[in-house]
């Protein structure tokens, strides 16, 4: 808000303590002084282009950042992974078929990935069918390999775009960065040799939708472009502007950090890497409108002060401060020398630090050096206090200060990669875990009997095998029975000897050894 009449020391003290000089305009070129009458005093119109005498205004359209534009540009994309599924079958002699599935990878082409993504996005069944395992083939006593190539689409995969060079940043890119997508190079390589990253929209530059068209007025002098009045009514000089491309669009970065799609007729230097642009958000846009209103209000205050001077036919240092030009450019400076009103042409510049205006005690830096005072009076109401300090009775609007601080705090920090290089995958195992291929796991399946023959041949062979097995069983049974009979019909000599017996007188059968014992016992002893 505008500063009202308050004690001078109470105004200066807080600023000195803070160490920050708010936005202020001081002449970098001034003089010579010439006496004027009070009737020659005039208030500067800070909304009229006076810089370098560029007073010719022509309407034109230009591009600037959209209101509400955020620091990062999100680009939706997808990853495409080439997968080869191999089915290996082996049929043994009995007819059992063993099938083993293996998965490998290959590097796909961009055109094939785009087609597969379109299938998935539109719900085309061909995409799901392409992910199925191959139908295994089999032949008796042979190993058969069947392979099938598939493209696995994983979406969304979002990357961050740098508006300065259209580079893309994501952890899946090598070193976290991709130089961009174009018609000649429609994809980005990833940390995995078999995976590509592609934007969902095939048209390059569509994701870089950060501009809006505004209407303003060009300020020229003899055909030379000096600056322009923007859509909010603020004049912006092209002094110190540098060339900067945003999303491939050529433009100028102005001294206040804003960007416009203007090109100066004379050659401008390219911006250095540390010269970033400021965000154009709703708050800054609202502040800029308020700044215009504040400048209009300041002019009304100046007219009121001028009317008071004309009415009272008296002037003071404080009232002279209202006549100062509030924006950079050409204007007038006023002072009192020996009680005489003096006027000088001046070119004002904007300053931010106390040291730019007061580099040392008692030194007011203006016109290229320490400006001399006349009886402790400088100009525009600036005086030298009895203790030797330079005192400035009026400072720029707090809204302008807030505006610049907002711009400075809204720098787009996209010169530095958004991805931490230490998080980039370095091992194959990590890459495999990241891809998470959504296909059937590697598995081993054993089917029923299958000799790889047609239907009737298989049943015929099974029947003949059953008959042969039955005949073999009968033959073996007959042979075993004959051998058993032969063994039973042939007596054992040992058993014959042991089973020989005699008949005693009493008619009882006695084993041969008992008979021998009785006979030997009946003989008389000698």
UniProtKB/Swiss-Prot annotation:
<keyword id="KW-0472">Membrane</keyword>
<dbReference type="Pfam" id="PF24834">
    <property type="entry name" value="PH_Rhabdo_glycop"/>
</dbReference>
<keyword id="KW-0325">Glycoprotein</keyword>
<keyword id="KW-0449">Lipoprotein</keyword>
<feature type="topological domain" description="Virion surface">
    <location>
        <begin position="20"/>
        <end position="459"/>
    </location>
</feature>
<feature type="signal peptide">
    <location>
        <begin position="1"/>
        <end position="19"/>
    </location>
</feature>
<keyword id="KW-0812">Transmembrane</keyword>
<dbReference type="InterPro" id="IPR001903">
    <property type="entry name" value="Rhabdo_glycop_FD"/>
</dbReference>
<dbReference type="GO" id="GO:0019031">
    <property type="term" value="C:viral envelope"/>
</dbReference>
<dbReference type="InterPro" id="IPR055448">
    <property type="entry name" value="PH_Rhabdo_glycop"/>
</dbReference>
<dbReference type="GO" id="GO:0055036">
    <property type="term" value="C:virion membrane"/>
</dbReference>
<feature type="glycosylation site" description="N-linked (GlcNAc...) asparagine; by host">
    <location>
        <position position="338"/>
    </location>
</feature>
<feature type="transmembrane region" description="Helical">
    <location>
        <begin position="460"/>
        <end position="480"/>
    </location>
</feature>
<keyword id="KW-0732">Signal</keyword>
<comment type="function">
    <text>Attaches the virus to host cellular receptor, inducing endocytosis of the virion. In the endosome, the acidic pH induces conformational changes in the glycoprotein trimer, which trigger fusion between virus and cell membrane. There is convincing in vitro evidence that the muscular form of the nicotinic acetylcholine receptor (nAChR), the neuronal cell adhesion molecule (NCAM), and the p75 neurotrophin receptor (p75NTR) bind glycoprotein and thereby facilitate rabies virus entry into cells.</text>
</comment>
<keyword id="KW-0564">Palmitate</keyword>
<keyword id="KW-0261">Viral envelope protein</keyword>
<keyword id="KW-1133">Transmembrane helix</keyword>
<dbReference type="Pfam" id="PF00974">
    <property type="entry name" value="Rhabdo_glycop_FD"/>
</dbReference>
<dbReference type="Pfam" id="PF24833">
    <property type="entry name" value="Rhabdo_glycop_CD"/>
</dbReference>
<comment type="subunit">
    <text>Homotrimer. Interacts with matrix protein.</text>
</comment>
<keyword id="KW-0946">Virion</keyword>
<feature type="lipid moiety-binding region" description="S-palmitoyl cysteine; by host">
    <location>
        <position position="480"/>
    </location>
</feature>
<protein>
    <recommendedName>
        <fullName>Glycoprotein</fullName>
    </recommendedName>
</protein>
<dbReference type="GO" id="GO:0016020">
    <property type="term" value="C:membrane"/>
</dbReference>
<dbReference type="InterPro" id="IPR055447">
    <property type="entry name" value="Rhabdo_glycop_CD"/>
</dbReference>
<comment type="similarity">
    <text>Belongs to the lyssavirus glycoprotein family.</text>
</comment>
<feature type="topological domain" description="Intravirion">
    <location>
        <begin position="481"/>
        <end position="526"/>
    </location>
</feature>
